[in-house]
Structures are given as C-alpha cells and as structure tokens.
C-alpha cells in the first residue's frame, strides 16, 4: 500500500470516528443539560425534555439506581465536592456510548467492507440486530438480578459484624457501570462464536474440543470481576456465561451441519 493510499484510509477512518464521537458527545451533553419532565397524555405518562442542568436526566438515572440497587440501611454519600457531578458524567457518557454503538458498528463495517468477503459481510449483517438485543439483555440481567444480590450480600456481611455501611457515589456508579458493561459484552459470546465459525476461521467442533479451557477462563473471569472472595457471587457471572457458551456451541455446530447438508 502506498503512502498516499494509507493517508486516504486514515482520513476516512478519522471522519467515521468523528461522527461517532459527535453523536456520543451530543447524547452525553443532552443528558446533562435536560430534565425528563412527566406529563399525562391520553391516560398514559410520557416524558418530555426541559432544560435543567441541575436536575438533569443523568441525575434522575443516578437517583433511580440508588432506589433500585442500594440495600435498605445503606447511605449513598459523596465525600468530596464534585463526586456526584462526575458520577453523572460517567452515567451520561455510558448512555452516549450505548446509543452511538449501532452507528459505530455501521461506520466500522463501511470502512472494512472493501477488505471483506461477501460471506463475511453477510455474517456481519445477520448478527447486528441480535448483538444489540443481547447487549441490552446482559445489562438488564445485571441490573435486575446480579447487582442487587451482590450489593445486598456484601452489605449483610458487614451488618453481621455490626458495621454501618456508607457507599461513596463514585464507587457505587463505577461498580454498577462495570457490571453493566461486563454483562453486556459477555452476552455477545454466542454471537462471537457463531460469527467466527460462520466466517470459516474455525470449524464447529472447535468449541467442543476446547470446552475445558473455555470453562476455566469463564470461571477465572467471574472471580476477577466480583469484588469479594466468597466464591458465591462469582457464579452470578460465570453461570450465565457458561450457558451462553453452550448456546454458542450449539448454534455454531448447527450452522456447520446445515452448510455440509447444503453442499452434499
């Protein structure tokens, strides 16, 4: 590749990346500048944006997280000025990244398209919608099931020793966002397995042959991401991932069988 061609590709990549950054920044700024005001419309509650940087949507999300996730008896506090603000910035940025993810995927696919085979492009299109759905499912599972249980479990350990718990807002938000991202990404596992098999990088039996190493890696990941050493909470991470691995193995093998049948 000549220096001129490389420069053209770099400029194209910069333009596409800039679009993603602009959308992410716009969504982040919107959440920090507007308040979601409820209103009644034909008997249903709807929300519309109202300029209010103090009681913004990021603050509303933070308050909802506090009410839904913080165990009863635990106080959410800030220990230095500005912690609550930066917690809201983190939340707004995560929402911005999430909203811009489909755009990022589209821009990346458009950039790589000239170098991809038609079969690889088809695989990418077929997994785009399921990827978004699985990411949302992973975040929902983490928010509804995993995070409340882990926080309550760890709080009760302290309570049994007569310890009063005060939870720093930055630590709380970082903890929640860590789990949301970890589960959103880990729920992509079956799609990654399917795509790798469909693109011909490995055969369908590869996942079954290496299952012991995969399970060991999943358990280590579960132990690493959970904050305690009890060996209990890690299974809330490892358990679903093991199920997802088996699901990915099933779909990868089924696709390979279909291709062999079609080629016979």
From Swiss-Prot:
It is a multi-pass membrane protein. It is found in: Cell membrane. One of its GO terms (cellular component) is TAT protein transport complex. One of its GO terms (molecular function) is proton motive force dependent protein transmembrane transporter activity. InterPro entries: TatC. The keyword Transmembrane applies. GO terms for biological process: intracellular protein transmembrane transport; protein transport by the Tat complex. The keyword Oxidoreductase does not apply. The chain crosses the membrane at residues 20-40, 85-105, 131-151, 175-195, 211-231, 232-252. Pfam families: TatC. Keywords: Cell membrane, Membrane, Protein transport, Translocation, Transmembrane, Transmembrane helix, Transport. Forms a complex with TatA. Part of the twin-arginine translocation (Tat) system that transports large folded proteins containing a characteristic twin-arginine motif in their signal peptide across membranes. Belongs to the TatC family. This is Sec-independent protein translocase protein TatC. It comes from Cenarchaeum symbiosum (strain A). The gene is tatC.
């Amino acid at each position: 590749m000549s220096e001129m061609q490389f420069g053209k590709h770099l400029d194209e990549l910069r333009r596409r990346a800039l679009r993603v950054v602009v959308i992410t920044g716009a969504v982040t700024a919107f959440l920090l500048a507007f308040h979601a005001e409820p209103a009644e419309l034909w008997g249903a509650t709807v929300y519309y944006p109202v300029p209010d940087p103090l009681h913004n949507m990021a603050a509303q999300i933070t308050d909802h997280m506090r009410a839904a996730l913080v165990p009863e008896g635990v106080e959410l506090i800030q220990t230095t000025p500005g912690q609550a603000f930066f917690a809201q910035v983190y939340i707004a940025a995560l929402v911005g990244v999430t909203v811009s993810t489909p755009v990022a995927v589209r821009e990346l696919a458009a950039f790589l398209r000239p170098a991809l085979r038609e079969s690889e492009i088809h695989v990418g299109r077929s997994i785009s919608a399921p990827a978004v759905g699985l990411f949302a499912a992973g975040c929902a599972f983490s928010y509804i099931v995993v995070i409340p249980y882990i926080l309550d479990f760890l709080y009760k350990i302290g309570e049994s020793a007569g310890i009063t718990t005060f939870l720093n807002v930055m630590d709380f938000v970082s903890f929640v966002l860590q789990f949301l991202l970890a589960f959103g990404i880990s729920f992509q596992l079956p799609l990654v397995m399917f795509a790798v098999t469909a693109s011909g990088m490995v055969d369908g039996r590869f996942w079954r042959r290496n299952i012991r190493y995969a399970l060991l890696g999943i358990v280590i990941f579960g132990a690493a991401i959970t904050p305690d050493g009890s060996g209990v909470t890690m299974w809330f991470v490892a358990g679903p991932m093991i199920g997802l691995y088996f699901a990915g193995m099933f779909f990868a093998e089924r696709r390979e069988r279909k291709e062999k049948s079609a080629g016979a």
